[in-house]
Amino acid sequence: MLNITISGADLEAALEQSKLEGLDISAVEADVHKLSESNLDSSASQNEAFQLLLSMSKLPVNSGYQYDEPAVPEGGSVILDSIATGDTGSTHDLSDHMEGAWLGMCIGIRVASALRNIPRKTAIEALKSASLWPISSLNNSFELASQVYTSNGTTTDMLEMHQQSQCWGAHRITDHALAALSMVEQNGEEFLPVELAKFCKSNFTSAIPANSFDNLLWSGENDNVPPSISPYREDSSALSTSVIWGLIAADNPPRAAQLATANAAISHTKNGLYTCSWLASLAASSCEEMTVPDMITESLAHIPANSRLADVLESVLEWYSLDIDLETAVYRVHELWNEANALHRYHSIPNAMIIAIALIWSGWQFDTALHAAVTSGFDVVGNTAAVCAVVGAHCGREEIGEQWLISGYDNLSTASGSSNMVSLSDAAGRTYNLVQTLRNYAQIR
C-alpha cells in the first residue's frame, strides 16, 4: 500500500496521464470514473483505488501509438553502472558562472513567487494595469506581490516576507540543490537517489513538497510500488530541481543527464525523466559559448529520439527558425495544454517547452529570459528558477544587473533543521569544487 491517501482527483489524473502516454484505458475507464465519484475514506476503498492504480500502471500501449518511450531511458537506471565522461577538457574559470547560476535561481524564485498558480491571462492583466510590463527589476516584483497578496487576502506577514531584503527566502528548489551538494560531498559516488530523497525529507522540510506532488510518498519509500503507479509520474516537480545536476557536472552534459535521470527515477518515468535529463544537460552546457538553439539541438541527444518531449522541442526550434514571435510561441503551448487543468499546469512537457522558449527567444539576455519565463504561465516558479539559473550560469554573476539584487543578496534562507541560513557564494563555491571532484567519478552506486 501507499503512504498517501488516494483521492478521486488522483484517480482521474492517473487516467488522464495514461491517455497522454498512449495507453489503452478501455478496460479501466468506467471503473475509474465510478470509484472517483465514491467515498474513498475506508481502508477497503483505498485498497480498491490502489489496485486500480496498479492496473493502470500495467496497461498496454495502443496499437499505432507514434512514440517509443521507455519507462527509464537507456543508461538512466537508479544505479548507474557507467557514467559517460563527455568532454572534461574545458579550462575556463567556472567560479563566476556557478555564482551566476545560484543568484539567477534565487532571483527567478523571488520574482515568480507572486504569480504562482495565477492564470497567465490574469497575471499579464495585473502586470499591465500596474505599469509593470515588462518586469525590469526586483522592485517590480515587490510591487506586484503587494497587489497580488492584497487582492488575495494574504496576510501581512507573507507580504513582508516577500519584500524583506536581508536574504533570499527558503524554497524547495534551492533546498533540494543544497541537499544534493551535501549528499555528493558526504558520499561521493556512494549514494542512492532514494537516500537523497530521504535526506531531503529529514533535513529540508520544503525540499520535497508536502502535497499530492510529493512523488516519494507514491513510490520512493516502497520497493514494491513502481513509480509508474503515480498519477504524477510525468509532472514537473523533478524537472524544476534538475539544474543542480547540470551545475555539478558542468561541461559534461552526458554525466549531468544521467545524474538527473538517476535522481528522478525513484518517482518519475518516461517524459518525467527525459525532461530532467534534458534540462540537466542544458545546465551543463550553459557555460559554453554557443547559441541557445544550438545548445537545445545538442541536448536532444540526451533524450529518446522518438518521444513526445523530443517532438515538441523540435517544434519549438522550428518555430524559432520561422521567425515566429515569442507571444505566438507561448500561445501555441497554451493551445496544446490547458493551464487551468492542474495535471497540465505541472506536467513536465509544457513546462519544458516554456523553458526552451524563454531561453531561445531571450538570446542569453537575463532580463528578457526572466520576463519571458515569469509571464508564460504553467509552473511559473519552477520554470523561472530554471531559466534564470541557466542564463545566470552562462552570463556569470557579473552580468546580472544590480536592479535584481537585494541588500543581503549573499544570504540564502533554508528549511534545514541544522542551519537556517547559508552563504550564496559559499554554495556556488561548493558547486564549483564538486565540478572538479565529479570529473574523477566513474560510477554512482
Language model regions located:
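Structured, active/binding-site neighborhoods that engage oxygen-rich ligands
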Residues: 1-445
